[in-house]
Amino acid sequence: MTRLTVVFLAILVLLPLATSNSGADEAPASLSDLLHRTKRCAGGNQCTTDAECCGNYQCRCSLASNCSGSNPKKRCT
């Protein structure tokens, strides 16, 4: 086979693999990400949004003094 034929065949084989929509291009969550999310699922852990809290927990300021400033300290409650 000529080089051109080999390149053409390689493209035919690899093109469907590169364009498949199997979700393989999504990076798996790292162990540290999973642990970080798990820690926030318990009540009382720090958060920035309700999405970081599990179940019926909501991200709220525990004290009014914690809510002032540009970096409020919130917890899942």
UniProtKB/Swiss-Prot annotation:
* Modification after translation (UniProt): Contains 4 disulfide bonds.
Q: Does the keyword Translocase apply?
A: no
Q: Where in the cell is it found?
A: Secreted
Q: Which UniProt keywords apply?
A: Cleavage on pair of basic residues, Disulfide bond, Secreted, Signal, Toxin
Q: In which tissues is it expressed?
A: Expressed by the venom duct.
* Signal sequence interval, chain numbering: 1-21
- This protein's record includes keyword Cell inner membrane: no
User: Which molecular function terms from Gene Ontology are attached?
Assistant: toxin activity
The UniProt comment on domains reads: The cysteine framework is XV (C-C-CC-C-C-C-C).
Q: What is this protein called?
A: Teretoxin Tan15.2
Q: What organism, scientifically named, is this protein from?
A: Terebra anilis
